[in-house]
């Protein structure tokens, strides 16, 4: 099983405030993330972390925390990721800036583009390829990005074609993510039933 998540910002105390995260402190946030992750992910699963796993890669506590997270971890590097410490880098099966994979929902296969940053025009977007991204958290920039994609579709831009353009923010603070890795099926289903429709304008 493949799972996806972004922008955990481990050991970044300021993220609790600017994301409005429902935790009193880092210890509480870390404990809940580990609990949700390890109650769901097995060591046979692959978790694609779409950037900003943490603010520091040379922290003994960070290395110890990430080491106990189950599964094969692939880090799609974000602007805050520091993997210069070999001990930390070796916790990931792969570290890269961009990835193209296939996943399935209900027996139907999908092409996915994985990147920390939202991409305005991605490979095969008109053929139904899904973009998973992070970086923008709950910011106005994320809403504008989604509105731009919807505008491209409405104006029949050639790279959008006739298909529904699918771009999903997998930031852990999003209502449909709720601080745990999600499968592609969960992301799609939970996003459309999110109690916060203002966060999912346009094509999500």
Show which residues each predicted segment covers.
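Short glycine-/acidic-enriched loop or helix-start segments at secondary-structure transitions
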Residues: 14-15, 58-60, 85-87, 123-124, ...
